[in-house]
Amino acid sequence: MSLSLWQQCLARLQDELPATEFSMWIRPLQAELSDNTLALYAPNRFVLDWVRDKYLNNINGLLNAFCGADAPQLRFEVGTKPVTQTLKTPVHNVVAPTQTTTAQPQRVAPAARSGWDNVPAPAEPTYRSNVNVKHTFDNFVEGKSNQLARAAARQVADNPGGAYNPLFLYGGTGLGKTHLLHAVGNGIMARKPNAKVVYMHSERFVQDMVKALQNNAIEEFKRYYRSVDALLIDDIQFFANKERSQEEFFHTFNALLEGNQQIILTSDRYPKEINGVEDRLKSRFGWGLTVAIEPPELETRVAILMKKADENDIRLPGEVAFFIAKRLRSNVRELEGALNRVIANANFTGRAITIDFVREALRDLLALQEKLVTIDNIQKTVAEYYKIKIADLLSKRRSRSVARPRQMAMALAKELTNHSLPEIGDAFGGRDHTTVLHACRKIEQLREESHDIKEDFSNLIRTLSS
């Protein structure tokens, strides 16, 4: 047996797992085979525990399939694989911790370091961190919709400049991207209080560059941004059509990456879908790890409301949280705004927070939601999105070009309306409720497996909720 055994396992796991999961958890592992033991080295304890918990059976199954009774024992360790003189296979043939995507010909990947090795000597500028100390990992409510994004952000905070550089988070407004940026900043500074961590909106970068040009201070501008330890930029899509800003950020990006300085970017859309941004920048955005944050599912919305109420020392009955979460689905910001209004009304009136009270306090907001999202509206939006007719959604046609949009529309109706499964089935040509249930489960499965389906679902949710 040789290291090619692990390479065979990698090839199979890459086929079996969603691309994001493989890049985040499997690719950073290093392997060493010795004395019939396959040692897998994880970059930190978090990755080790996650892989052992989630993928141990997958890996053991592959080892047994490839080797039968001679399958090696599996051992997990934190750290990097020791290099010995007897190792015949070059180190670069083993998946390195910093390799998170297919290698780019124009970039030489930096060696894996902590992110703080060879930090430049203290520079003249006074760094404006702008990191909000209130946004931490502890008060970020985790759910299925944001689990991968939070895990990736946590690893970056623990190992800046390491495996996931750059980290690119994308999703609709109010889903927690900014919270995670601040949480990473707080995490880095908790470990290294003197770290130069800068958070900013992309428009601030543009404003600073314009000011530097006006004051003939472009060199100071470059020195400021290229000597930070971590640069966290929100809403990168606002660089669109700003050619000089893109040019300067391109060189800043390259300088930071070469110095193992961490970059985290957020956007409201997938990198390649950002219009008005140069292809060379969009390509670099995808060099590290790209993770989507989707609208929170019902259970997460309830958890967000309960946590927010607890932070305000307010007792929120579970049935009230469920009532609000069931009706307000688009994003976290909307949920928190609604709860703030309920709390304010309760404080002003001295009344208990009940479902009837919430109906009254949020009357206009709930009416607007019910008016905006109807099954008819969903059918119209889905038909336009997939360029088919509404009649096709209601028909008995079973071709994939029609069946998949129909399943998508049914899943959206279940997610965005209060209609029962039989009612949804009736609205789609008199179909049985079991057909609707199958459609919902199918779309949920495809969202895990297919980037295109995940994007379609998120885009349609955003359109219908806006």
Swiss-Prot record:
Residues 1-86 are annotated as: Domain I, interacts with DnaA modulators. SUPFAM superfamilies: P-loop containing nucleoside triphosphate hydrolases, TrpR-like. ATP binds at residues 174, 176-178. GO terms for cellular component: cytoplasm; plasma membrane. One of its GO terms (biological process) is regulation of DNA replication. Residues 86-129 are annotated as: Domain II. Keywords: ATP-binding, Cytoplasm, DNA replication, DNA-binding, Lipid-binding, Nucleotide-binding. Transmembrane segments: none annotated. It is found in: Cytoplasm. Residues 347-466 are annotated as: Domain IV, binds dsDNA. It comes from the Bacteria. Residues 130-346 are annotated as: Domain III, AAA+ region. GO terms for molecular function: ATP binding; ATP hydrolysis activity; DNA replication origin binding; lipid binding. The keyword Plastid does not apply. PANTHER family: CHROMOSOMAL REPLICATION INITIATOR PROTEIN DNAA. Plays an essential role in the initiation and regulation of chromosomal replication. ATP-DnaA binds to the origin of replication (oriC) to initiate formation of the DNA replication initiation complex once per cell cycle. Binds the DnaA box (a 9 base pair repeat at the origin) and separates the double-stranded (ds)DNA. Forms a right-handed helical filament on oriC DNA; dsDNA binds to the exterior of the filament while single-stranded (ss)DNA is stabiized in the filament's interior. Domain I is involved in oligomerization and binding regulators, domain II is flexibile and of varying length in different bacteria, domain III forms the AAA+ region, while domain IV binds dsDNA. Belongs to the DnaA family. Oligomerizes as a right-handed, spiral filament on DNA at oriC. This is Chromosomal replication initiator protein DnaA. It comes from Salmonella dublin (strain CT_02021853). The lineage of its organism: Bacteria, Pseudomonadati, Pseudomonadota, Gammaproteobacteria, Enterobacterales. The gene is dnaA.
